[in-house]
């Protein structure tokens, strides 16, 4: 019998990628707003610079980082190559914006032309791609077995500290699965990045097309839940509740489709792996009922999980790519701002958000989580942890200025608003207490699809 260990130690299995998926992305929930493409922050005009040509040998990759407030362009002239599992088209130019970190890998060799301002650009033959593709091959065998037996496919939790390439590995494994005709669920519970919505959210998407080279997965209608903070530690109780809720809905979706069920689930996690963060990882593993955990570049975490989780959960230690770059707190903050900006304005400033006033009386605004009180001050039978998931009504005030608001799909306050998905996001750009209105930046024109709004701790200054 072929095992995960034997696959991981086998030679490269790149010849597995023979079929391609060209189906329409499944819409997880009906969306009432056209929120556009979640792309990169903004597009800058290509600098007039001489292009560089790189000739890549077999099993090597070109790595480059785009300078701040600059842009770069890549074109494949000869051969074949891929970016995080998505194949590049020959003689097509791909644009990358400020701060982009790109790796183009080739199994058989290629020639690439790079134009623009980059902080660094070099070719490396030291990559973990063989290990990654063999991991995919092992997962694919599990999917094939699940398809034959009409059972559930593999559920993979990708864990590790910050800046080890967890999101990239999830994207790569998802793309490889899609290229073999699978339809995996990609879930993101890293609230610091918010790949499915905005920072401060978690979400999931059924993927049936490979990620776009420039824009990533086209999140036309992901399932997204409001969390409201940048770290799971800010409201541990709420975070675990939402992760469990997301897992429950994914289970329902898998029950509705044999293809999705056998394709499995790939889950990206936050880089918080100590203390309560480690407990959150274990709870996520239980909520999603994972059978494989990929630990990136953290032997301590690998051994902890081996000791604490059941034997049926296969835990593998994978190396990180040498191209992974550590980010400072300032860079992380810039990345969050860019993520919000791209939501409203698009990759190439090709989206045009709307600005309009909202009357105080037309909406109901809430914050999830009340200040903690001593047990002695709480009502009989209530625990202090319960306050973390309590819905607190807010009176509109100047303190709303620049805060991100989630538009809840709940139609009335009688709904379980905390565990209801959101339809989209707004930013408060002005508050007029005299007129009892506040101004919002919105992806679509008025009226709002629903009137229940949830406040985030996350703020955004709309300065272009």
Role assignments for model-derived ranges:
Residues 42-151, 158, 172, 231, ...:
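Preference for solvent-exposed, low-hydrophobicity sequence contexts
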Residues 155-175:
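Glycine-rich phosphate-binding P-loop
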């Amino acid at each position: 019998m072929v095992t995960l260990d034997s696959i991981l130690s086998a030679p490269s299995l790149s010849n597995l990628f023979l079929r391609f998926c060209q189906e329409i992305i499944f819409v997880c929930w009906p969306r009432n707003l056209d929120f556009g493409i979640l792309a990169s922050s903004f597009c800058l005009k290509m600098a007039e610079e001489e292009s560089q040509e790189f000739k890549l040998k077999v099993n090597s990759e070109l790595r480059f980082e785009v300078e701040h407030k600059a842009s770069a362009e890549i074109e494949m002239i000869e051969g074949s190559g891929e970016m995080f599992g998505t194949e590049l088209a020959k003689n097509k130019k791909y644009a990358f914006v400020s701060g982009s970190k790109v790796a183009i890998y080739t199994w058989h060799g290629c020639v690439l032309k790079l134009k623009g301002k980059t902080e660094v650009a070099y070719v490396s033959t030291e990559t973990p791609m063989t290990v990654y593709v063999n991991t995919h091959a092992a997962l694919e065998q599990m999917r094939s077995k699940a398809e034959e037996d009409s059972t559930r496919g593999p559920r993979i939790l990708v864990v590790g500290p910050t800046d080890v390439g967890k999101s990239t590995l999830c994207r790569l494994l998802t793309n490889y699965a899609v290229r073999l005709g699978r339809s995996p669920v990609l879930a993101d519970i890293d609230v610091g990045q918010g790949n499915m919505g905005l920072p401060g959210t978690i979400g999931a998407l059924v993927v049936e097309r490979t990620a776009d080279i420039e824009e990533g997965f086209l999140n036309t209608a992901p399932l997204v839940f409001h969390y409201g903070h940048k770290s799971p530690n800010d409201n541990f109780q709420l975070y675990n509740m939402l992760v469990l809720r997301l897992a429950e809905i994914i289970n329902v979706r898998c029950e509705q489709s044999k293809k999705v069920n056998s394709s499995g689930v790939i889950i990206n996690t936050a880089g918080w792996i100590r203390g309560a963060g480690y407990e959150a990882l274990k709870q996520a593993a239980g909520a999603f009922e994972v059978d494989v955990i990929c630990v990136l570049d953290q032997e301590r975490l690998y051994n902890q999980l081996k000791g604490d989780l059941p034997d049926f959960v296969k835990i593998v230690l994978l190396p990180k790519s040498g191209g992974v770059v550590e980010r400072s707190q300032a860079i992380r903050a810039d990345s969050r701002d860019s993520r919000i900006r791209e939501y409203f304005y698009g990759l190439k400033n090709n989206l045009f958000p709307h600005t309009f006033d909202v009357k105080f009386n037309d909406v109901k605004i809430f914050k999830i989580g009340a200040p903690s009180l001593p047990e002695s001050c709480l009502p009989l039978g209530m625990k202090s942890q319960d306050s973390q998931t309590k819905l607190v009504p807010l009176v509109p005030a100047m303190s709303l200025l620049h805060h991100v608001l989630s538009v809840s799909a709940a139609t009335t306050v009688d709904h379980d608003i905390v565990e209801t998905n959101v339809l989209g996001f707004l930013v408060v750009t002005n508050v007029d207490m005299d007129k009892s209105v506040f101004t919002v930046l919105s992806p679509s024109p008025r009226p709002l699809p629903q009137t229940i709004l949830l406040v985030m701790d996350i703020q955004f200054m709309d300065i272009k």
